[in-house]
Amino acid sequence: MVLFSLVATHADIDLETVAQLSTGASELATSALSGSPAVKGAVVLATCNRFEIYGEAPHPDDVEAARAALVAQISERTGLNEQLVSRSFNTRTGGEVSQHLFAVSSGLDSAVVGEREIAGQVRRALINAQHEGTASSGLVRLFQAASKTAKDVGAQTALGSRGLSIVSVALDLATDLSENPDWSAKKAVVFGTGAYAGATMSLLRERGCTDISVFSSSGRAEGFVATRGGKALDSDTLPAAVAAADVMIGCSGSDTRVEAEELARVRAGSAQTLIAIDLALTHDFDPAVGELDGVELLTLESVRLAAPQEQAESLAQASGIVTGAAAAFEQEREARSVDSAIVALRRHTMNVLDAEMEKVRARHGCTAAAEEVEFALRRMVKQLLHVPTVRARELASNGQQEQYIAALDALYGITVEQPAAAPAAECPVDHGRAGQAPADVRRETA
C-alpha cells in the first residue's frame, strides 16, 4: 500500500479556483472508493484556503490511476475541465505526503503561519472520513501522527504563541479600519454556526464586543447562542440587525451570498461605516459590496497579505520537529509493511510444512519418529527463514520494502494483505447542508 496526496492551496493557485475545486467535497471520498479499485482509502481536507485529498493505493503503479479517478470525480462534481483540475493539484507520494501534512497541521503552511485552527481542521477531516468509512488504516495512522506533531510543535516551540489565526488577523484589520477601535461599542453580526463562527464569537468577546447576533438559515442559531451567548436572528430580524451593524462576518461558505444590491437596500440611510469580513472560501459576501459607499470589505487575501511573520528561530525549531516526525513516521510505516511480508512468508512456509506432516502422520501415525521429523523440519524452516527475514529488515531500512514484497509475489505467489479501512469514528459527524435562507440576505451552512 502506498500513500499519496493531491494538494491545491493558496500558495499555488488563486482562492477562487480552490473554492471551485472544493465543491461537493463531502461526498468525494466515498464516490472515489466506490468508483476506482486504485483508491483504497481517502481523506479530504478542505479549509478556507486549501483543498487536499489524501489517499492510499494498493501499489505505487496504481497512484496515477487513483489520481485520474479523483480528478475525474472532481471535474464531474464541479463542472471544471479535467485538464484544469489536473493542473491545479500538486501530487505527492512517499515521504513527501507525511512531510507536507505534518507541516500543514502544525501551521507552517498556513496563510497565517503558526495559526492553531488548522490542527483542529485536520482532526475533523479524519473523523469525517472514519464516519464515512473511507479512512484506510494507513491514513488513520498518518493523520493521528500529524495531530501529535502539531501538539509537539505547540509544546516545544514558540510558534503560534501570539495566538494568531485567520480570524484574529481579520479582526485586527477591522480595528485598524474603524473610526472607533473600541469593540465594546460595536454591534456585530455573524453568519454561520460552524467552527469558524465559534472562533469568531470567542475572539469578539476577548476584544470586548458584547452585542453579537448570529444568523443561521438552518435554524441552528438558537442552539449556537445558547452555549456561547449572543442573539439568534431569523429571516425577519436579520435585515434590521445588518442595518445597525458595525461589523458583519461571514463564516459559512454557502452557495448563496449577500449580494451588493440587497446590502445597499438594507443599509440605505446609514451614516456609519460597515466593515464586512468575508472568511468563507466560496464568499459569503458579493465582492461588489466593497464598492458600496460606507462599506469596507476584508477577504482571505487581505488576511494573507497582512499576516505578520513568525520569528526565524521558532520556524526553524518547528520545521525540525516536523522533519523528524515525518522521518520517524516513514520508518515506522516501512517496518510495518515489511513485518506483514515476513508474517506472510512464515505463514506460507508453515502451511507447506503442516501439509507435509499430515502426509507423514497418515502413513506412519503419530509416532515418536513422526515427532522427530516434525521437529527437524521446523528447525530447518526456521533456519531457512532467517536470511530472508534479515534481508527484509535491511531493505525496509533503505526504503526498498516494496522490492521484497514484489519478490514474494513473483517467487511464491504470496500476496501481502494489509487492512484497507479503519473503524468508523465513535462520534457522529453532521455532513448535511443547510437549507434556504431569507431572500433579504442569504443562505448559509451551519
UniProtKB/Swiss-Prot annotation:
Active site (catalytic residues): C48
Region (Disordered): 425-446
Recorded GO MF terms: glutamyl-tRNA reductase activity; NADP binding
Record carries keyword Phosphoprotein: no
Residue(s) at site: Important for activity: H100
Subunit structure: Homodimer.
Functional description taken from the UniProt entry: Catalyzes the NADPH-dependent reduction of glutamyl-tRNA(Glu) to glutamate 1-semialdehyde (GSA).
Note from the entry: During catalysis, the active site Cys acts as a nucleophile attacking the alpha-carbonyl group of tRNA-bound glutamate with the formation of a thioester intermediate between enzyme and glutamate, and the concomitant release of tRNA(Glu). The thioester intermediate is finally reduced by direct hydride transfer from NADPH, to form the product GSA.
PANTHER family membership: GLUTAMYL-TRNA REDUCTASE (PTHR43013:SF1)
Name of the protein this chain belongs to: Glutamyl-tRNA reductase
Gene name, Swiss-Prot/TrEMBL: hemA
